[in-house]
Amino acid sequence: MNCPVRGALANRESALNVGIDRFWAPLAMLATQDIALRLQFRRSMVLNPEHLPHHGPVLLAPTHRARWDALLLPMAAGRRISGRDCRFMVTTTEMCGVQGWFLQRLGCFPVDQGRPSMTTLRLAIDLLADGQQLVVFPEGQIQRNDQPIQLRQGLVRLAQL
């Protein structure tokens, strides 16, 4: 699938400064956390939220078992709990079309899993250096089995830095 997201990574500085759109982020929280998640799960509880840092770099690497993960994580570790937004590294295919338009405004940025670039890794490093909260699903895709996860090289490199 051809999707014009590579150009968005060319200027890392703008990706750092744009961040989370002030208009779309509250609407996304309302739609996901207050409506969709409550309808789907009725009740949710975050255990030990005091363990989430409120400042400084945070790298979250949760397992990815369902599409709900990307909605549940900001509810469990995002703005309402930690006072911070989650910046997701997502696949290039996720950043296409209307969905990609919204994801970009919510602070997501793409990684081409077939040909990961140093630019993407550098942006992730820059976000962490800026004290932001970065989310990377270590499997790189939804895994619905009970097998041990295979970490992608980029996450390993990122965690080592």
Residue ranges of model-derived segments:
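Hydrophobic alpha-helical segments of integral membrane proteins
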Residues: 28-36, 99-102
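Soluble, non-transmembrane catalytic domains of enzymes that act on hydrophobic metabolites at membranes
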Residues: 1-8
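Helix-enriched interaction subdomains in cytosolic or periplasmic regions
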Residues: 17-31
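Soluble catalytic domains of membrane acyltransferases
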Residues: 21-22, 39-161
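Polybasic, low-complexity association/targeting segments
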Residues: 8-15
